[in-house]
C-alpha cells in the first residue's frame, strides 16, 4: 500500500447544472447549526464551480447572515424553547403540531422544487420531532444521497438515548443515511 487512499465519489453531479446540495437544520436555539451549514455550503460552492446550495432553516436570525456564492435560503417558521425547555411555536402562531406540519411541508416542497443531488441533515436524524421524515423517505426512494451531520458531543448519553430511541430514528440512522459525519 502506497499510503494513498482512493475514494469513490458517492454522488455524481448532473451534467446540466452541477451539484445541487440541500442543507437542513431545525435551528431552534443558538446559531451553531446555521453557521455550520453556511460554512459547508460555502465550501461546497467554492470547491465545485457549478455547484449550488439551498439552506432550509428555522433560525430566526437566518436572513441576517451573508450567504455564500451560489447559495440561497428557505426560512421555515421558527420554533423555540420555553423556560421549561419545551418546544413552542414562534410568531407563526397556532399549535406546535400545526407549525411542525407546515414546516414539514415546506421542507418537502423545497426538496421537490430544488431537486438536490445531496441532502445534509444537521443535528436531529429525523428533523425536529420528525419533521424531515417525509422528505427523507421521498429522497431515499428517489436515490438522492443523504448525509447526517452532527457535533462530536450532542448531549448527555441518557438524553441522546431518550431522544433517538424510536423506530423513525433507527430507520434514518441504519437505512436512510449514506454517510454520517461527525464534526
Give the positions of each predicted feature.
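Conserved nucleotide-sugar phosphate-binding/catalytic loop shared by glycosyltransferases and other
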Residues: 17-19, 25, 43, 47-98, ...
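Nucleotide-activated donor-dependent transferases that construct or modify glycoconjugates
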Residues: 10-30
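Structural motif
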Residues: 20, 117-118, 179
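A short, glycine/small-residue-rich beta-strand->loop->alpha-helix junction that serves as a flexible
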Residues: 25-38, 61-62
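Active-site-proximal region of nucleotide-activated glycan assembly enzymes
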Residues: 135-183
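Histidine-anchored nucleotide/phosphate-binding helix
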Residues: 34-45, 133-139
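Conserved nucleotide-sugar donor-binding subdomain of glycosyltransferases
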Residues: 89-128
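An aromatic- and histidine-rich active-site surface loop
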Residues: 61-63, 120-138
Amino acid at each position: 500500500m502506497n499510503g494513498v487512499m482512493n475514494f469513490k465519489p458517492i454522488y455524481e453531479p448532473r451534467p446540466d447544472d452541477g451539484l445541487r446540495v440541500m442543507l437542513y437544520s431545525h435551528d431552534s436555539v443558538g446559531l451553531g447549526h446555521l453557521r455550520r451549514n453556511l460554512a459547508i455550503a460555502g465550501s461546497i460552492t467554492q470547491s465545485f464551480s457549478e455547484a449550488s446550495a439551498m439552506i432550509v432553516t428555522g433560525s430566526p436570525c437566518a436572513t441576517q447572515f451573508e450567504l455564500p456564492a451560489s447559495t440561497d435560503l428557505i426560512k421555515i417558521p421558527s420554533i423555540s424553547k420555553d423556560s421549561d425547555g419545551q418546544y413552542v411555536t414562534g410568531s407563526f402562531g397556532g399549535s406546535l403540531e400545526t407549525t411542525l406540519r407546515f414546516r414539514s411541508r415546506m421542507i418537502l416542497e423545497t426538496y421537490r422544487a430544488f431537486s438536490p443531488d445531496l441532502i445534509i441533515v444537521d443535528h436531529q436524524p429525523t428533523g425536529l420531532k420528525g419533521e424531515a421524515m417525509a422528505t427523507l423517505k421521498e429522497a431515499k426512494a428517489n436515490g438522492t444521497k443523504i448525509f447526517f451531520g452532527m457535533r462530536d458531543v450532542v448531549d448527555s448519553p441518557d438524553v441522546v438515548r431518550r431522544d433517538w430511541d424510536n423506530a423513525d430514528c433507527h430507520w434514518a440512522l441504519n437505512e436512510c443515511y449514506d454517510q454520517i459525519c461527525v464534526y
